[in-house]
Amino acid sequence: MSDNPQKLLKRSVTIAGHATSISLENAFWIRLKEIAVLKDYSLNQLVSEIDKTRTGNLSGAIRVYILENLGQNK
């Protein structure tokens, strides 16, 4: 994975049995994985949880979820 926190990276995740691609900046991928570990979830499980409650696009919902969780798990 790139060291540049602003680099946009595309990853494939599985939601409800369907593969989908998500583009996020490296910094968001790092934090999303940290949150998944803290919750004892796989990355797919965490993204599925976010997907269930989103009203907009998935990438945006993930970014908002991460921002809302900053500091809660430290």
Regions found by a protein language model. Give the residues of each.
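Amphipathic, hydrophobic secondary-structure cores in small proteins
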Residues: 14-66
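Short, solvent-exposed charged binding patches
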Residues: 67-74
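A detector of short terminal or domain-flanking linear segments
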Residues: 1-13
